[in-house]
Design a protein with these regions (language model features):
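A short glycine-threonine-serine/GTX helix/turn-capping micro-motif
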Residues: 65-71, 184-193
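Predominantly a Rossmann-like dinucleotide-binding segment in NAD(P)-dependent oxidoreductases
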Residues: 12-13, 20-101, 236
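Aromatic/hydrophobic pocket-lining residues that form π-stacking "cages" and hydrophobic walls in ligand
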Residues: 1-3, 29, 228-229
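Contiguous beta-strand/loop segments that form the cofactor/metal-binding neighborhood of enzyme cores
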Residues: 79-163, 187-212, 227-229, 242-281
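Rossmann-fold NAD(P)-binding glycine/threonine-rich loop
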Residues: 1-13
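Short arginine-rich
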Residues: 225-235
Length: 281
């Protein structure tokens, strides 16, 4: 909040690299929800599971402020959820240190409540055979997507963001809907991931004064939920989410914490084109 105030005071542009908004699988999920094909969404699970059984010598795995899996990946999964559904009513978080020698959390499981809807955010470092990245169940069907976004690995391997294949995830999702003739499965091709979009929008914001790609108030909202989650884990209970409650949490949070857009209403009208799909018989 101090940074936001400072940026406003000096008429500067401030944003945060929430790059997971431009993951191929998340862009595809957003468009699928907007299409209304799943109907009223009752259950969404967002997993970021990997197999990293050994603790590495790097700051994010040490007992220092801001370390741990909840800060590392929870921030992205929370931001994606807020982009889809807005602020939840309640939040419950479970944290664990599962690996031998772990100094901070390497497992989290969060439950966000939106009325009857439940959103599960989960990440672990001990999953050799990962399940789905996204699982969604609605009144008209279900959707399941395997595999993590490819852009990070492409960048590590030296692939240029200007390459035609950059951001292309060849693993389609599976949409299952129920018709009068029974279940119908469709293979849903992914939209193209595009981390460059953040930087292009940031350039426009600096040069032309257009909105930044990730608004400061959205960043503050994610941080408030991170802090609320840590309190939930410490107290072992579900906590309500609200402006007054979140203000209290942020004010009470120590300066060095120990290691450890608009809401999308469902159902939705049409908004943009539906991801390409191929029926499966």
């Amino acid at each position: 909040r101090s940074l936001v105030s400072l940026a406003q005071e000096h008429d500067l542009q401030l944003s945060v690299f929430h790059n997971r908004r431009w993951d191929a699988d998340f862009l595809t999920l957003q468009q699928l929800l907007h299409s209304g094909e799943l109907g009223e969404v009752y259950h969404l699970e967002s997993h970021f599971d990997r197999f990293r059984p050994e603790v590495r010598d790097r700051w994010r795995e040490q007992a220092v402020p801001g370390s741990g899996l909840w800060y590392d990946l929870g921030a992205h999964l929370l931001d994606q959820t807020l982009q889809l559904f807005g602020q939840p009513e309640t939040l419950w978080l479970d944290l664990a240190q599962q690996r031998p020698g772990a100094k901070t959390d390497d497992f989290f499981h969060a439950v966000l409540q939106y009325g009857a809807r439940r959103v599960i955010l989960h990440a672990s470092t001990q999953v050799a055979a990962p399940g789905a990245r996204f699982t969604v169940h609605g009144s008209l069907g279900s959707y399941r997507k395997q595999g993590l976004d490819v852009q990070e690995e492409q960048l590590k391997s030296g692939t240029s963001p200007l390459d035609a294949q950059f951001g292309c995830d060849p693993r389609p999702g599976l949409l299952t809907t129920v018709t009068a003739q029974g279940p119908r499965e469709q293979s849903i091709a992914n939209l193209t991931g595009n981390y460059r979009a953040f930087y292009l929008q940031m350039v426009e914001a600096i040069q032309r004064g257009t909105p930044v790609p990730v608004k400061p108030d959205e960043v503050v909202g994610v941080m408030e939920l991170i802090e609320l989650g840590l309190r939930s884990a410490r107290e072992g209970r579900r906590l309500p989410v609200g402006a007054q409650h979140l203000d209290s949490v942020v004010q009470q949070a120590p300066s060095s914490s120990p290691a450890h857009t608009a809401p999308l209403a469902m159902p939705l009208g049409q908004s943009g084109s539906t991801p390409r799909s191929t029926p499966r018989h």
